[in-house]
């Protein structure tokens, strides 16, 4: 079989592929699109296809488990392996939508350390294997702001000091945490406060202060475009998307790390996946030490394996050290919040309902 990407993927610059069933032996890999999918294509997909002779259909989605659930419950599974957030991996596993994965099948570190000891603690779950540590941050266009520049999460909510539109993802996740941080809640107390009705009210009250100035986004490629088009003066975003726009496209974008919400993404394999064995082989290959290090040269997301970190070098431009660009860099972690997957697995539905009602109000 050809060891090249499907023409649909190339033609759409890693956009959403046509929703047609994959041909036999063609692995369907689903991820978030844009610079992130490109990093996976370069570090995982192309080398795996060259090694195995298989082809890959690469599709994009906007997260969540709704599409996974619909396919599995209908008995019409066309996706094989999907990149998900940790809370979604836990929910999908609990609902029997994805298969358990034994960490013993994963590649050991180059020095022989078993994978279970090489992955960063908390990055292996019953049904998921992590690839990267990523972060939701906010960013601004340096050419559009005169004088003092934003430096704290409070500045994002300060329309008087920094007038103009804000971009935010159309979801309660991260937005509620940002709101509480900006309202003075210490990073270590965010989820304790948010677990109470009073905490939820407090977060929405803070969001109320900028609601009329928010442009909502859903796909990860949108925030850099919103900044580039001048539709917003600052926006929440995935750190890797902003880095790619700045380092790869020379955009004058700056990341504010204060108050970042960091998380991990994992591979899960759908129950009933038409190419289960190929999916398992791809998962093993793409979570090896070298593959994870290779991805980090394409985008500023930290590898989930300890043994990968020393192998991370320069960005593709050959002049940008990737270490300081990672969410896990010490300077970037000073006021960081780790996404609490248990909280979101338990409260996602009710907070989605509350958030949607708030949007409509």
Predicted regions: what they are:
Residues 137-144, 180-182, 264-276, 294-297:
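A bilobed periplasmic-binding-protein/Venus flytrap-type ligand-binding module shared by bacterial periplasmic
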Residues 331-361:
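Conserved C-terminal helix/tail region of periplasmic/extracytoplasmic solute-binding proteins
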